[in-house]
């Protein structure tokens, strides 16, 4: 499920960081399919508990409880990535240079896009909160860097995911991340949108 995917992602980050210099980028869209895997698993658990306790639950109640537990799992998974990156030191004693890419249009369908939006929302909320240092004080972590892509679905106040853009702006005001990329401008300049933290310094593809 989603938690397992997040754990594996952090292990990959650690392995790559220990065997190379320079940065690495991950896209939250790669984690999005695992949200539905967890949803289905949690739903089965809720139905089994309902039967075991002999409590009749409506479809609406089952769906509501499933989504609540799912949200908790997404929150834990995002926290795992944040804290692992913050506490991880590479073999040369540095924190890994990790960039997290938030791009709704990488989702393969509408359900996956909604699930990706849930991960992005949680990532931004946790970054706004910050992380606790050794003294228990909430601080701004240096990594992972965040990049948020502006697109038709989130750029105007009547677009379905505009609330994420507002949350991103709030996060930038407090934590100086994320950075922003325009899907439209990037496609015009480069022909595609790249998951890279050094976007405008990379050579054009041949």
Which residues does each predicted region cover?
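Catalytic cofactor-binding cores of redox enzymes
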Residues: 1-197
């Amino acid at each position: 499920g989603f938690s397992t995917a997040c754990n594996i992602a952090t292990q990959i980050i650690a392995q790559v960081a220990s065997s190379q210099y320079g940065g690495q980028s991950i896209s939250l869209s790669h984690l999005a399919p695992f949200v539905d895997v967890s949803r289905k698993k949690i739903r089965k658990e809720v139905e089994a508990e309902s039967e075991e306790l002999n409590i009749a639950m409506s479809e609406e109640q089952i769906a509501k409880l499933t989504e609540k537990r799912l949200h908790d799992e997404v929150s834990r998974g995002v926290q795992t990535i944040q804290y692992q990156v913050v506490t991880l030191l590479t073999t040369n004693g540095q924190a890994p240079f990790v960039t997290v890419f938030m791009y709704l249009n990488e989702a393969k369908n509408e359900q996956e896009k909604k699930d990706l939006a849930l991960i992005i929302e949680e990532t931004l909320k946790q970054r706004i909160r910050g992380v606790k240092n050794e003294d228990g004080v909430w601080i701004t972590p240096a990594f992972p860097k965040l990049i948020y892509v502006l697109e038709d679905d989130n750029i105007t106040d009547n677009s379905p995911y505009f609330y994420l853009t507002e949350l991103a702006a709030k996060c930038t005001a407090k934590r100086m991340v994320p950075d922003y990329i325009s899907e439209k401008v990037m496609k015009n300049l480069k022909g595609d949108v790249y998951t890279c933290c050094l976007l405008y310094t990379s050579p054009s593809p041949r």
